[in-house]
């Protein structure tokens, strides 16, 4: 289907498609953790007198069923897709994954209440020199909203604060890629505190050297 960081969202789409068309009544999306990722950045952490924090195996499971009229639904009519023609520039990828899907449904980027891209815990990635991955993604999404005329440049910090979230997931390979927010999104959707959430899965460019495109 798709690999690496693009795998979780692609798996959820496949599962939701089977449930929606009636091919399967109940579909479980299950993922194990990554042993090679344990203490992957420990050398950099130790150098900076930071405790080696990558000490847990991640896992994920989600049960997808046909629409029962009560549980929040996955919108299969407004899926994002990074096509070959979109190009490999970060702006092009962000547009394909976060601007075009709402547009297909007649919505703006500001109609999405929460965005869930790669949700790596910054307490782990910052000392390792990898930066704050979720924050960087949110700033890029906000900047695209400015370019599309949907928010003002001065509103970027507000957009990031309201529609983003701190990274809270261990660096367990594909596990942090958007899907850990689904449980929280279900609670928020049922409580009525949000109306829409977008789960974003994007693989790294270095994994797609044959096409020079991110997965």
List the predicted regions and their residue ranges.
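Short, well-ordered alpha-helical segments in soluble proteins
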Residues: 19-22, 31, 67, 105
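Flexible, glycine-rich active-site loops centered on histidine and acidic residues
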Residues: 24-57
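Condensing-enzyme catalytic core mediating Claisen C-C bond formation in acyl metabolism
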Residues: 44-117, 123-126, 139-152, 156, ...
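Short acidic, gly/pro-rich beta-turn/loop elements at beta-sheet edges
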Residues: 39, 73, 209
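Small-side-chain structural scaffolding
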Residues: 7, 11, 15, 27, ...
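Short alpha-helical "patches" and their helix-cap loops
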Residues: 27-32, 77-78, 195-202
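Claisen-condensing/thiolase-fold acyl-transfer catalytic domains that form or cleave C-C bonds
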Residues: 1-23, 91, 115-215
């Amino acid at each position: 289907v798709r690999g690496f960081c693009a795998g979780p969202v692609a798996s959820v789409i496949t599962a939701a498609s089977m449930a929606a068309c009636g091919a399967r009544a109940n579909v479980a999306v299950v993922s194990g953790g990554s042993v090679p990722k344990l203490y992957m950045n420990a050398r950099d952490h130790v150098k900076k007198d930071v405790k080696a924090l990558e000490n847990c195996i991640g896992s994920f499971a989600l049960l997808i069923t046909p629409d029962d009229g009560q549980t929040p639904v996955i919108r299969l009519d407004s899926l994002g897709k990074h096509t070959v023609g979109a190009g490999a520039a970060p702006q092009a990828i962000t547009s394909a994954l976060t601007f075009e899907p709402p547009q297909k449904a007649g919505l703006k980027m500001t109609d999405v209440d929460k965005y869930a891209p790669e949700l790596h815990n910054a307490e782990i990635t910052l000392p390792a020199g990898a930066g704050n991955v979720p924050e960087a993604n949110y700033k890029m999404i906000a900047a695209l909203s400015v370019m599309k005329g949907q928010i003002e440049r001065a509103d970027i910090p507000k957009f990031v604060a309201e529609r983003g979230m701190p990274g809270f997931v261990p660096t367990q390979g594909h596990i942090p890629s958007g899907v850990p927010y689904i449980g929280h999104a279900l609670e928020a959707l049922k409580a009525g505190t949000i109306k829409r959430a977008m789960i974003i899965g994007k693989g790294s460019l270095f994994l797609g050297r044959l096409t020079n495109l991110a997965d």
